[in-house]
Design a protein with these regions (language model features):
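Amide-forming acyltransferase catalytic core, primarily the GNAT-like/NAT-type
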Residues: 1-40, 44, 95-218
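Beta-hairpin (beta-strand-turn-beta-strand) motif
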Residues: 35, 52, 81-82
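Residues forming well-ordered secondary-structure scaffolds
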Residues: 44, 60-64, 80-87
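Conserved acetyl-CoA-binding loop-helix of GNAT-fold acetyltransferases
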Residues: 51-72, 78, 226-239
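Alpha-helix termination/capping residues and helix-transition junctions
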Residues: 70, 187, 242-243
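Active-site/acyl-donor-binding loops of N-acyltransferases
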Residues: 76-137, 191, 204-227, 234-311
């Protein structure tokens, strides 16, 4: 909880958890993930609200808290959410920015089958599907590409390309301080890898290790070439496979370039969630696709201990 709500975050010195109280009772709660959206030459201060909830009475307490949080940023972002979120956000004037899709690729179908709590026909069907997907997925790494793990104490002195806006696509900034914050996550192991081609830095990815599932919570390569994006994601799968307990690798993305690359690397679409942005400063939202991954929220590290598999 301390790391999530109070640990130091760049450009957000205060607590990131907020409550609304009435007569000493908490009636609404929400926490924020501070983000900086890069679009053309603009820097848009965005917050993603997580852990948002409110009591039925007094009516409107959750909406009021959301509006108060919105006063601290240019925009508020929602990715999916509860039925209440999906109703309230559009009612507040939020604009839909597409869909965030979840993807998964099986790593060890037999190990997953042996770990099933209930060995029924559904488990057998999942094994057969996972085996088929594994056989169909590409496995060889492209020549000249390599991934090198970067530890927290190496981060400040290691150069690698970070996300930059492209024509028709807005991205979220990745500062050294924000990456360092995630490497200090106490609930899951998060690994950072710099990606190189012929020893030239080209990009990076972040993995969250949750025993049976490895998540690609962020990935980027400084290229518009589909082959370079495939190399990036195949390297991520290769590193995920180095964890012997992992039976699948999962990720999330909204932009078409990343999504197409994931499909070509053997990932399968496992569901989607609506993206919404609420313009709080009235200075205008990005007129482009919004690139969203797991790192924009608590999907990067959230789990209940058992880890629900999705492949």
């Amino acid at each position: 909880m301390r790391w999530k709500y109070w640990d130091e975050w760049p450009d957000w010195p205060a607590s990131r958890g907020y409550v609304m109280a009435q007569d000493d009772d908490i009636v609404a709660h929400g926490a924020v993930v501070p983000l900086t959206c890069l679009w053309e030459d603009r820097r848009i201060k965005v917050v993603r609200v997580i852990d948002w909830g409110a009591r039925a009475k007094p009516v409107g307490s959750g909406v009021l808290l959301m509006k108060r949080i919105g006063q601290m940023a240019d925009a508020v972002m929602a990715v999916g959410g509860t039925e209440m979120t999906l109703k309230i956000f559009p009612a507040l004037g939020a604009k839909k920015f597409g869909m965030a899709h979840s993807y998964a690729r099986p790593l060890r179908p037999l190990r997953r089958l042996l770990g099933e709590r209930k060995a029924d026909w559904r488990a057998g069907a999942r094994f057969a599907r996972g085996l088929l997907w594994s056989v169909q997925a590409p496995s060889s790494l492209p020549p000249g590409w390599a991934a090198r793990r970067i530890t927290a104490d190496q981060l400040a002195s290691t150069h690698f390309p970070r996300p930059t806006p492209r024509p028709g696509m807005a991205v979220f900034e990745r500062s050294t301080a924000s990456l360092d914050y995630y490497l200090r996550c106490p609930s899951v192991l998060i690994e950072l890898y710099a990606v190189e081609k012929s020893q030239v830095p080209r990009g990076y990815f972040l993995l969250a290790i949750l025993r049976r599932q490895v998540r690609i919570i962020e990935s980027w390569v400084d290229s518009n070439d589909a082959g370079d994006w495939r190399a990036l994601h195949l390297l991520a799968v290769h590193q995920a496979r180095r964890h012997p307990d992992a039976v699948e690798v999962a990720t999330m993305s909204s932009d078409p370039v990343t999504r197409q690359s994931l499909v070509e690397c053997g990932f399968h679409d496992r569901g989607s969630a609506e993206l919404h942005l609420l313009d709080c400063s009235k200075q205008g939202l990005p007129g482009a696709d919004l690139r969203v991954q797991m790192l924009e929220g608590d999907a990067a590290y959230l789990h209940d201990g058992s880890v629900s598999l999705i492949a």
